[in-house]
Amino acid sequence: MAVQKDSNKSLSPLITQASERHWARLTEVWSEGLANLTAAQQQELKTVLGLSDYIANQLTRSPEWINALFADDLQQVERKLFDAQLREQLASATTEDMAKRLLRRFRNYQMVRFAWRDFLDYASLEESLLDLSALAEALVIGARDWLYKEMCVQYGTPMDKAGNPQPLLILGMGKLGGRELNFSSDIDLIFTFPEHGETVGGRRSLDNQQFFIRMGQRLVNLLDQITVDGFVFRVDMRLRPYGESGPLVVSFSGLEDYYQEQGRDWERYAMVKARSLGPWNHFSDELHSLLRPFVYRRYIDFSAIESLRKMKQLIAQEVRRRQLTDNIKLGAGGIREVEFVVQSFQLIRGGREPSLRQQSLFGAMDTLYSLGQFEYLAVDELKHSYLLLRRVENLLQAIDDKQTQTLPNNALDWARLCYVLDMTNEIDLRTHIEAAMAKIHRHFKATVGGEEGEEKAEHWTAQLWNVQQDDHAINLLAEQQIDDDKLWPLLSRWRETVTKRSIGPRGRETLDKLMPRLLDELLNQPSPSAAFEPVSKVLEQILTRTTYLELLCENPGARQQLVSLCCASPWIAVQLAKFPMLLDELIDPAHLYDTTSLDDYPSELRQYLLRVPEDDMEQQMEALRQFKLSQQLKIAAADVTGVLPVMQVSDHLTFLAEAIIEQVVMQAWQQVAVRHGVPSYLAESSDTGFAVIGYGKLGGIELGYGSDLDLVFLYEAPENMANSLTNGDRPIEVGHFYLKLAQRILHLFSTRTTSGELYEVDMRLRPSGASGLMVSEIARFGEYQAQEAWTWEHQALVRSRFVFGDNSLAVKFSQIRACVLEQSRDKDELKKAVREMRQKMRDHLLKVSEGEFDLKQSPGGITDIEFIAQYLVLANAHEYPELSIWSDNVRIFGVLAELELLPLMSAQHLTQSYCWLRDENHRLTLQQKSGKLAYADVAAHAERILAIYQAILE
């Protein structure tokens, strides 16, 4: 039987209350067993029940473990036995569900044992971390080996080309790799296999990579899935090549190619701790040999310091954004800083010093001391400070098996920590923790060369922000030669308004630090008062969100971008004020102005959505909106700084919309299919039988900021299947299925979340307009266009384009569109119809004062140009089918000029004027102004356009 080390320690009243509560629960399920315990055993059990809710909950579920725990030697763990014990238990598992239960029961028993030892101080921290790491490794390898046998029975054994069996190797990363795993840590893994080939001896052959990807998926499920018995470990696979967008398993050669060609600096840091799990063999040797050149350079590599600085900056930004106060891992002087210090030295000198190529943090520290890279005092301070933080972290997590590194926010958990660590009270323990973190941060700053501070000694802008008398403020501005008499009244009134707001002491302190720094930026603008107005509107929206004030306070680049973008575009200022999450985009100017490549929007969006659980519909909707807002901000930032010309701005906004349309349709499809299944004839297909047609600006690849989407939905059903049903639990007719799909798509677009509406969608261009069905069968759509549609609907069809759907539907839509546009038409009747429609639009939409010009609707404006293009296509496409190819006006004018249907000079005038007018419209949008200019500013363009319009259409 184990004996508690200090049996005279008394429990605090809070711990005693927790103990009594858990003892009462345990008595309800195991009263006879408790009565049979000795007095010493009862006292020890009561102590651990009071210290750990996790132990209490597990023992209440499995009280028979209590006798087993007392029978075991709690003061010693034979971690070498884990593998054999687990192998013996898993041998009886005949299904994955049985294996899951055995793995989880084994894990939970051992974790209770470890927590018991930790809380009663039976084990040093180093022992605990080794025990936890050994348990995790045994569980991962035990699950892998059991699953490998199951998979080989099903698919055969994976072989290389020479006929040698191929294993799945697992790299343990992070603390698992370093054998320093804490109590509730997730485990970072990378799966790999030696060589390509295929399986042999199974019911059907599989490519090796397919085999191992399936095995990897099932292995993650074995370990990570939450069942009634909990989970084994949370598994994180994001450190693999290409992260979440990469294959789950890659070959050795795939790993080598990735790290040689695309490996990033942070991945070098991650790879320092990488270790092949399980028994070591020649494959393990080969794997570590191919990774070594990427991690450890042959030369002394001081670039590691700069990489470290950047990574720490990103972590600090994340801490601020997520408001992680009291975080002993990520905060200044936290656990991560010790790891960074040691790993940076390993990366710098590991290429020359093989002894530094080790996963253990403590071992690396000792080696650095022996090599003369660390002073004894530095090693001693770092070790003792690190051990204290890791001990606190381990105990925090063992209280309730939660993955936390944040100090408690309740008195009971502080009492528990103080009891185990022999501290008098919370203040005493906090003092020790803060002292340890201060020592760590001092060594970290010495390693990375410090951090650029901004604490300027009583800068005059601090005086300006704090000054109370108007005369004093005006004198301060005059001394600095600031000639802007509107600034002080604005600043003074705003400060008075802010003073009345309830923003809390932390918010107030942060604002007082931020404002002098922000004033520095504002006073560098041509008109500080004009700059202050939009910036102050943003600040007003984040006053109660201290994390964003801190972000601006501690990031000079973000402040600079905030001021410059708000000055350049009131529209951007409004976006930042409405959606403060966009402030995160300002942190890295290089990233902000690096717009996504046109073809990369779909993959970027897929990557972004991977952060959100697939089954969390609200979070998926919010993520779509956040992605749109952040990408739109990047486009606007590049626009106002002249990085993107107008044609490319519209291209980016259009391609962004198309990527979002694809995701919205697929999400809607999944949501409807879960309830009703899919059309039976699509059960074995990845096709949807559905298409989205873009009209108007989307169709013409000419979207602007805030443009709505003109959409038409089509579907295709085989003739003999038109009335067939879906294959789900609640089957419905195919037409009804696609109607529900259309309704769900519109819901996903239009629902307002905290990040607003995704897009406003206009469906009025569908067959029969507002009175028509929400979605049309494509054959019926073709009939309508050919026989019933009005001329204005054919004009709209000129600007239509297939934007999402199956290839077969794309072909059919293109055929219908070409067939309709290429109809022979009476030109006089066509002219009359086009002119009448143009006049109707003008009568309905044109509202200008004298001397004003509406860029879209005034005579000689954008709409006149569009009508010229549409008329010329409809009038001539029957003779010149190439006119039906394009949906955008610029390329239509190009084709018309080539065919000599439009004089070259006229085509150039129309194209130039069209681009200029759209550019002005973009500019006015970014200035938060309506699309109107003084007629005098537009006269040259308008008169030229009107002359061409009249020559062609009148």
Curated annotation (Swiss-Prot):
Question: Which stretches does the entry tag as region Adenylyl transferase?
Answer: 458-954
Record's catalysed reaction(s): [glutamine synthetase]-O(4)-(5'-adenylyl)-L-tyrosine + phosphate = [glutamine synthetase]-L-tyrosine + ADP; [glutamine synthetase]-L-tyrosine + ATP = [glutamine synthetase]-O(4)-(5'-adenylyl)-L-tyrosine + diphosphate
Q: Which GO terms describe its biological process?
A: regulation of glutamine family amino acid metabolic process
Keyword Protein biosynthesis among UniProt keywords = no
Write down the required cofactor(s): Mg(2+)
Q: Name one GO cellular component term.
A: cytosol
- Region described as Adenylyl removase: spans on this chain: 1-452
Provide this UniProt record's keywords sorted from A to Z. ATP-binding, Magnesium, Multifunctional enzyme, Nucleotide-binding, Nucleotidyltransferase, Transferase
Q: Report the EC code(s) recorded for this entry.
A: 2.7.7.89, 2.7.7.42
What protein is this chain from?
Bifunctional glutamine synthetase adenylyltransferase/adenylyl-removing enzyme
This chain's source organism reads: Shewanella oneidensis (strain ATCC 700550 / JCM 31522 / CIP 106686 / LMG 19005 / NCIMB 14063 / MR-1)
